[in-house]
Amino acid sequence: MGKRIPMFYLDPRSVSTHAMAMSNLGPSHFKGFELSNFQRKAAAALDTDHNVLVAAPTGAGKTLVAEYAIHLATSQGKRSLYTAPIKALSNQKFRDFTEDEAIPSVGLSTGDISLQSDSQVLVMTTEILRNTLIEDAESLANVGVVVFDEVHFMDDPERGSVWE
């Protein structure tokens, strides 16, 4: 039987202040931002090698948790994959990550574009990740984190099968 994957599911709407105070919280700041309780809890889970699924409203700070995971993997010498459902979002995240001085190299793979595919952080569409898993899974051996942005697309009738 396969290894059990530890996971935390964090919904900031259901995390009480008291429960957070009684549990192990991660760092209080990251990239100049003060982290909310759910972000700190997610960081603590990531610090202890747990997988994290964050469900939160727009603007609640999910991206900062994803960036924390990527920085953590980078500090451990691992690669990171950041997936997005559409090319435009992949292109935007590529630009964002290239401006992050803590990330040594950033690549992009969208089907139309393939730049530096051996980079520390590789931004790609979800279809590219699926194809890589099927055709070249060994190339993912040193991956420490995979971020699925806009995971609610799993429920999309036209695109959902890619996420499954």
Question: Which role fits each region the language model picked out?
Answer:
Residues 1-52:
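Helicase-associated low-complexity/disordered flanking segments
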Residues 32-164:
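Conserved P-loop/Walker A NTP-binding site and adjacent catalytic elements of P-loop NTPases
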